[in-house]
């Protein structure tokens, strides 16, 4: 039996021992060394050859990733590590650090219980470090810290032992500050990264060595020894004495929770059902014999097997051939194959039990974030939807060069939308174009070139990238009458800005898009009140949609309940296109204050009520001082001081705002905010301005009001592009 086959047998045995499982991720800012770390962990565990590790990037098994040298999708692998005389199963997920692929990070966080946060010793804590940490803590995923590229501090920056320790302390303090700020209340102190107990490791993933304080005490290696090994170019010897995989996986096993421990506090966070029900208790206990409950964290498309769903099981067991039920899409499915991940390969196993991460085929309608259960015991409600820190801010129009490819293109676009719920796909019925919205230029490029071009074999024409704008209101409208086409039904409404605290709760994912069939559910009402909505209004919310809300403030109108669903539909249609540039509306509250209906139901059907509400909502929004909002990005530039002026000039030329500046040694760090519309071509420009000597990164930071003097011009450009008549 080969080494790999033995590994598979061990994995099968350990899957049943909860206290010996760790579901963990590796996450970091782009290029801080996540994938190199993952590869060397695999090599140490005997999954790939040691000679190739670091160069092989086994988890970057997509051609596009290998070519760009960055991780685009989150990859999964299971491996075994021995610690304290016992073997442990480690299910490892490597996540992307590039801001355009943040959706994959969010989805991966749902699958794991602990994370190794990788931070480059040279660059320190960067924006994406903060973002991935925020996502981890939001999902109650416990972090430990690995400070990477320590050899560069010694060989390139020539730091003394005192300076080295100072640099480490600064990074640890910054990470701990973020944990204190963002961790759930009960873990703010417990989850701090403490050097002495070994929750922090230092090393070089590329050169395959790492140390931690407990390991130094055990092995007798000191900081001075490390400096000597690095200066004498003997990092190979250091890797034999302090192997990376041993130090990092020991830290993970000692400090990250097993599924049994983690599910006790994670389940109430991601599932809002009855904690006292059988399924509630079973998930908290991670019971393999309980009712089935799992969540799809990723869809991977395989040329031979079709769509493969990566799934974290919280309760129960899945065997090959089992009937399953998908709660979100309300579809039945069958588990055709049940496997574990081994990098790019999958190894079939007879069954998978609670607490593990597995690969399932046969779930054709599943999307990332989908809840999986048994058709005989349906999980109501499903798991909380995955909320992303970024939003799609750039749209391109694509058309198939050959019309015969059109059906295939539509199928591929559907598949992409299922795989990645940060992509929006829309079909413009009038022009026949397909619109794809993504997180940034790179995200869109990977979709059009790789997913459609390379994998789908379809040649497409891609339009110029278009920035996604939004509309909102700054005032309150007068009472507006919405009249049905037959003039027999009238609804009276007022548009006003949504309460700031309520909208902030919506953006943070504390309240969701939801239709309330009869009246607001008790859980929904409690969340709204907690977010700051008036208690009387919270009871009467009819629907929340795309960050807008409609509240029924009428009294004693009998027919209103019958017309409820039609009113909600009219409201949704009304906020899909704003009055300025037909962009989506956000942050609007519609108060329905009165209504009169025809007593005969035949005269108050969908063709009458929906348009009455739609026109009323649009009119109310138009009379409430509407404004355009544009997407913004936080831009961080790390540049030698000589080029600081050039970096600032580049920001200022793009309508940017400098928020903060710091000096660190001979480097300057510029923090700024720039509209997405002004960021095209920034990569080349900033490289040119600083002669390629700067590091920079961007992150979506929300929508802000377009300057008043630019609004008419931008609104006109959007209207002209959409073929709408000018205002």
Swiss-Prot record:
<dbReference type="Pfam" id="PF14492">
    <property type="entry name" value="EFG_III"/>
</dbReference>
<dbReference type="GO" id="GO:0005829">
    <property type="term" value="C:cytosol"/>
</dbReference>
<dbReference type="InterPro" id="IPR035647">
    <property type="entry name" value="EFG_III/V"/>
</dbReference>
<dbReference type="GO" id="GO:0003746">
    <property type="term" value="F:translation elongation factor activity"/>
</dbReference>
<dbReference type="InterPro" id="IPR027417">
    <property type="entry name" value="P-loop_NTPase"/>
</dbReference>
<feature type="binding site">
    <location>
        <begin position="94"/>
        <end position="98"/>
    </location>
    <ligand>
        <name>GTP</name>
    </ligand>
</feature>
<keyword id="KW-0963">Cytoplasm</keyword>
<dbReference type="InterPro" id="IPR020568">
    <property type="entry name" value="Ribosomal_Su5_D2-typ_SF"/>
</dbReference>
<dbReference type="InterPro" id="IPR004543">
    <property type="entry name" value="Transl_elong_EFG/EF2_arc"/>
</dbReference>
<feature type="binding site">
    <location>
        <begin position="28"/>
        <end position="35"/>
    </location>
    <ligand>
        <name>GTP</name>
    </ligand>
</feature>
<dbReference type="InterPro" id="IPR009000">
    <property type="entry name" value="Transl_B-barrel_sf"/>
</dbReference>
<comment type="function">
    <text>Catalyzes the GTP-dependent ribosomal translocation step during translation elongation. During this step, the ribosome changes from the pre-translocational (PRE) to the post-translocational (POST) state as the newly formed A-site-bound peptidyl-tRNA and P-site-bound deacylated tRNA move to the P and E sites, respectively. Catalyzes the coordinated movement of the two tRNA molecules, the mRNA and conformational changes in the ribosome.</text>
</comment>
<dbReference type="InterPro" id="IPR031157">
    <property type="entry name" value="G_TR_CS"/>
</dbReference>
<protein>
    <recommendedName>
        <fullName>Elongation factor 2</fullName>
    </recommendedName>
</protein>
<keyword id="KW-0342">GTP-binding</keyword>
<feature type="domain" description="tr-type G">
    <location>
        <begin position="19"/>
        <end position="260"/>
    </location>
</feature>
<dbReference type="InterPro" id="IPR014721">
    <property type="entry name" value="Ribsml_uS5_D2-typ_fold_subgr"/>
</dbReference>
<keyword id="KW-0547">Nucleotide-binding</keyword>
<dbReference type="InterPro" id="IPR000640">
    <property type="entry name" value="EFG_V-like"/>
</dbReference>
<dbReference type="GO" id="GO:0003924">
    <property type="term" value="F:GTPase activity"/>
</dbReference>
<dbReference type="InterPro" id="IPR005517">
    <property type="entry name" value="Transl_elong_EFG/EF2_IV"/>
</dbReference>
<dbReference type="Pfam" id="PF22042">
    <property type="entry name" value="EF-G_D2"/>
</dbReference>
<dbReference type="Pfam" id="PF03764">
    <property type="entry name" value="EFG_IV"/>
</dbReference>
<dbReference type="InterPro" id="IPR005225">
    <property type="entry name" value="Small_GTP-bd"/>
</dbReference>
<dbReference type="Pfam" id="PF00009">
    <property type="entry name" value="GTP_EFTU"/>
</dbReference>
<feature type="modified residue" description="Diphthamide">
    <location>
        <position position="603"/>
    </location>
</feature>
<dbReference type="GO" id="GO:0005525">
    <property type="term" value="F:GTP binding"/>
</dbReference>
<dbReference type="InterPro" id="IPR000795">
    <property type="entry name" value="T_Tr_GTP-bd_dom"/>
</dbReference>
<comment type="similarity">
    <text>Belongs to the TRAFAC class translation factor GTPase superfamily. Classic translation factor GTPase family. EF-G/EF-2 subfamily.</text>
</comment>
<dbReference type="GO" id="GO:1990904">
    <property type="term" value="C:ribonucleoprotein complex"/>
</dbReference>
<dbReference type="InterPro" id="IPR041095">
    <property type="entry name" value="EFG_II"/>
</dbReference>
<keyword id="KW-0648">Protein biosynthesis</keyword>
<feature type="binding site">
    <location>
        <begin position="148"/>
        <end position="151"/>
    </location>
    <ligand>
        <name>GTP</name>
    </ligand>
</feature>
<dbReference type="InterPro" id="IPR053905">
    <property type="entry name" value="EF-G-like_DII"/>
</dbReference>
<keyword id="KW-0251">Elongation factor</keyword>
<dbReference type="Pfam" id="PF00679">
    <property type="entry name" value="EFG_C"/>
</dbReference>
């Amino acid at each position: 039996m080969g080494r790999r086959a033995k590994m598979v047998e061990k994995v099968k045995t350990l899957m049943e021992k909860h206290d010996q499982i760790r579901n963990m991720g590796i996450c970091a800012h782009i290029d801080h060394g996540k994938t190199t770390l993952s590869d060397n962990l695999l090599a140490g565990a005997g999954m790939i050859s040691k000679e190739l590790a670091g160069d092989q990037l086994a988890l970057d098994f997509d051609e596009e990733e290998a070519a760009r040298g960055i991780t685009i999708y989150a990859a999964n692998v299971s491996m075994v590590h021995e610690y304290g005389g016992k073997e442990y199963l480690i299910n490892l997920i490597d996540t992307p650090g590039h801001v355009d692929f943040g959706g994959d990070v969010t989805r991966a966080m749902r699958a794991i219980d602990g994370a190794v946060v990788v931070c480059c010793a040279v660059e320190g804590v960067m924006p994406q470090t903060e973002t991935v940490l925020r996502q981890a803590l939001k999902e109650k995923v416990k972090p430990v810290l690995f400070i990477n590229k320590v050899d560069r501090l010694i060989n390139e920056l020539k730091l003394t032992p005192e300076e080295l320790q100072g640099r480490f302390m600064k990074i640890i303090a910054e990470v701990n500050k973020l944990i204190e700020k963002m961790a759930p209340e009960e873990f703010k102190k417990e989850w701090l990264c403490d050097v002495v107990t070994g929750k922090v490791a230092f090393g070089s993933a590329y050169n395959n060595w790492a140390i931690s304080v407990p390991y130094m005490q055990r092995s007798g290696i000191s900081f001075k020894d490390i400096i000597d090994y690095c200066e004498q170019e003997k990092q190979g010897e250091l890797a034999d004495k302090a192997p990376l995989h041993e130090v990092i996986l020991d830290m993970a096993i000692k400090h990250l929770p097993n599924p049994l421990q983690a599910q006790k506090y994670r389940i109430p966070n991601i599932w809002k059902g009855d904690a006292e029900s059988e399924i509630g208790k079973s998930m908290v206990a991670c019971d393999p014999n309980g009712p089935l409950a799992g969540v799809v964290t990723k869809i991977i498309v395989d040329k031979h097997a079709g769509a493969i769903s990566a799934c974290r099981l919280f309760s129960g067991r899945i065997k090959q051939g089992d009937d399953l039920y998908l709660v979100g899409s309300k579809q039945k499915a069958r588990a055709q194959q049940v496997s574990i991940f081994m990098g790019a390969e999958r190894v079939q196993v007879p069954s998978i039990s609670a607490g593990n991460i597995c690969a399932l085929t046969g779930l054709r309608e599943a999307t990332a974030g989908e809840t999986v259960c048994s058709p005989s015991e349906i999980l109501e409600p499903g798991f909380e939807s995955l909320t992303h820190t970024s939003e799609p801010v750039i749209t391109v129009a694509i058309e198939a060069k050959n019309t015969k490819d059109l059906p295939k293109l539509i199928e591929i676009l559907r598949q992409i939308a299922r795989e990645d719920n940060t992509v929006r796909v829309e079909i413009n019925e009038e022009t026949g174009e397909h619109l794809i919205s993504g997180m940034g230029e790179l995200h869109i490029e990977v979709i059009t070139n790789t997913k459609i071009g390379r994998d789908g074999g379809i040649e497409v024409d891609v339009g110029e990238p278009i920035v996604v704008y939004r509309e909102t209101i700054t005032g309150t409208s007068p009472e507006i009458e919405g009249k049905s086409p037959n003039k027999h039904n009238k609804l009276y409404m007022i548009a006003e800005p949504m309460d700031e605290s309520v909208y902030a709760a919506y953006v943070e994912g504390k309240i969701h898009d939801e239709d309330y069939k009869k009246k607001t559910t008790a859980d929904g009402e409690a969340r709204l009140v907690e977010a700051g909505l008036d208690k009387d209004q919270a009871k009467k919310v009819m629907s929340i949609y795309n960050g807008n809300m409609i509240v029924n403030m009428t009294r004693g109108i009998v027919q209103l309940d019958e017309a409820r669903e039609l009113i909600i539909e009219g409201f949704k249609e009304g906020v899909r296109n704003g009055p300025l540039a037909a962009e989506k509306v956000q942050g609007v509250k519609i108060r329905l204050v009165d209504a009169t209906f025809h007593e005969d139901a035949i005269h108050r059907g969908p063709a009458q009520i929906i348009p009455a509400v739609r026109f009323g909502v649009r009119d109310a929004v138009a009379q409430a001082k509407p404004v355009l909002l544009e997407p913004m990005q936080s831009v961080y530039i790390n540049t030698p001081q000589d080029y600081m002026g050039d970096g600032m000039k580049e920001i200022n030329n793009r309508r940017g705002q400098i928020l903060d500046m710091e000096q660190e040694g001979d480097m300057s760090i510029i923090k700024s905010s720039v509209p997405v519309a002004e960021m095209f071509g920034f990569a080349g420009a900033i490289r040119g301005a600083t002669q390629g000597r700067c590091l920079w990164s961007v992150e979506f930071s929300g929508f802000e009001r377009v300057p008043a003097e630019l609004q008419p011009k931008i609104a006109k450009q959007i209207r002209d592009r959409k073929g709408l008549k000018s205002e």
